[in-house]
Amino acid sequence: MVFYKYSGSGNDFLITQSFKKKDFSNLAKQVCHRHEGFGADGLVVVLPSKDYDYEWDFYNSDGSKAGMCGNASRCVGLFAYQHAIAPKEHVFLAGKREISIRIEEPNIIESNLGNYKILDTIPALRCKKFFTNDSVLENILTFYLIDTGVPHLVGFVKNKKLLNSLNTLELRALRHEFNANINIAFIENKETIFLQTYERGVEDFTLACGTGMAAVFIASHIFYNTPKKAILIPKSNESLELSLKNDGIFYKGAVRYIGMSVLGSVFENGCF
């Protein structure tokens, strides 16, 4: 079994093909492990589709499945084109979402996330019990729960330096309380937003999270009146352009092909 490793906005993914749909949860945990496997934020299994150029099953590094991953969608789009699975402009199925891909330059990929849903606005008082003394989150008045394929809780701080002082235990508690990824962001100006994401499945801060960047983008646009196009800068410092077109969210940014790996003794460890 051959795996191709790609990176987008600091997220890295292993991509493989299968002609048969089955549970790859154990395989994902094994191959994504940073010390005992190849190491990646997630596993993408590309599958044939009758109605689309292809479809995928996406697994987080802990083996859990997710319907959508924004940065992985751009990576798999480039993979599909480079391996003659699909043309430069194509559509694939991610869970129940149709994802369109457009390759603008050799490594600049645009993908659409589709529609979003504002699930709730949450007064910070509901979250105070999770904060430690002198928490950097204490000055956040409102959190926003937004579904961009997966649920995200978004809060904005007033000082960029606070993004480097976030408490992992606080964010982990919020993650379990709301069963959502946690995003803390700072709006530097109307078109530039910095953020940090504590991600489900990774259970820690992640270098980037495409759906999290989308949730921050939407929250800033709706509640802070930022424009319909902005640059989002995650922990990796690899920026991503997000835009809103006809109520759909679009990503555009660079994707890198890293290399290829071949599965060996992992079969002996009970992955299947």
Swiss-Prot record:
GO MF annotation terms:
diaminopimelate epimerase activity
Q: What is this protein called?
A: Diaminopimelate epimerase
Single biological process term from Gene Ontology: lysine biosynthetic process via diaminopimelate
**Which top-rank group of organisms is this from?**
Bacteria
* Biological role stated in the UniProt entry: Catalyzes the stereoinversion of LL-2,6-diaminopimelate (L,L-DAP) to meso-diaminopimelate (meso-DAP), a precursor of L-lysine and an essential component of the bacterial peptidoglycan.
Q: Where is substrate bound in this sequence?
A: 11, 60, 70-71, 181, 199-200, 210-211
Annotated coiled-coil segments of the chain: none
In chain numbering, where does the site feature Could be important to modulate the pK values of the two catalytic cysteine residues fall?
152, 199
- Locate the active site: 69, 209
Record organism: Helicobacter pylori (strain G27)
Q: Where in the cell is it found?
A: Cytoplasm
What's the Enzyme Commission number for this chain?
5.1.1.7
On subunit structure and binding partners, the annotation says: Homodimer.
| Entry-linked PROSITE patterns | DAP_EPIMERASE
Q: Name one GO cellular component term.
A: cytosol
